[in-house]
């Protein structure tokens, strides 16, 4: 169930971590480049004010940049922490290893 919205969650992160909107934008920059997503000051301002909600791409970027779950950032009553991501290296190990369950247990 959705209890809050993205604006409330962003404001909470900003307060808890002593961040400004420009700091959030700076944190997103490397991920925006990596995933070819454009985000600017106006976007962050509108998300923080509640005027608009981020689309799926921008929500993903905000989630990884702030190290929070996208569902939490959207306002759902779920844990704030991101689930552990499986890296390309982990996937390579899975396919190269005969003992699949051992590799999965170590992820």
Where are these regions (language model features)?
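Recognition helix of helix-turn-helix/homeodomain-like DNA-binding domains
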Residues: 30-54, 76-78
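A short, Lys/Arg-rich alpha-helix, primarily the initiator
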Residues: 1-30, 34
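Conserved hydrophobic/aromatic packing and binding residues within compact polymer-binding modules
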Residues: 10, 24-25, 44-47, 73
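Interfacial/linker helices and their anchor residues that mediate assembly or domain coupling
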Residues: 79-107
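Helix-turn-helix DNA-binding elements, focusing on the entry/boundary residues of the two helices
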Residues: 21, 41, 56-59
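DNA major-groove recognition helix of helix-turn-helix/homeodomain DNA-binding modules
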Residues: 55-72
């Amino acid at each position: 169930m959705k209890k809050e919205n993205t604006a409330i969650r962003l404001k909470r992160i900003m307060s808890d971590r002593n961040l400004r909107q420009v700091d959030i934008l700076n944190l997103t920059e490397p991920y925006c480049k990596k995933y070819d997503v454009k985000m600017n000051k106006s976007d962050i301002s509108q998300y923080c004010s509640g005027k608009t909600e981020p689309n799926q791409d921008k929500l993903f970027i905000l989630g990884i940049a702030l190290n929070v779950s996208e569902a939490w950032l959207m306002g759902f009553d779920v844990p704030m922490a991101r689930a552990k991501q499986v890296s390309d290296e982990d996937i390579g190990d899975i396919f190269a290893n005969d003992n699949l369950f051992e590799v999965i247990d170590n992820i």
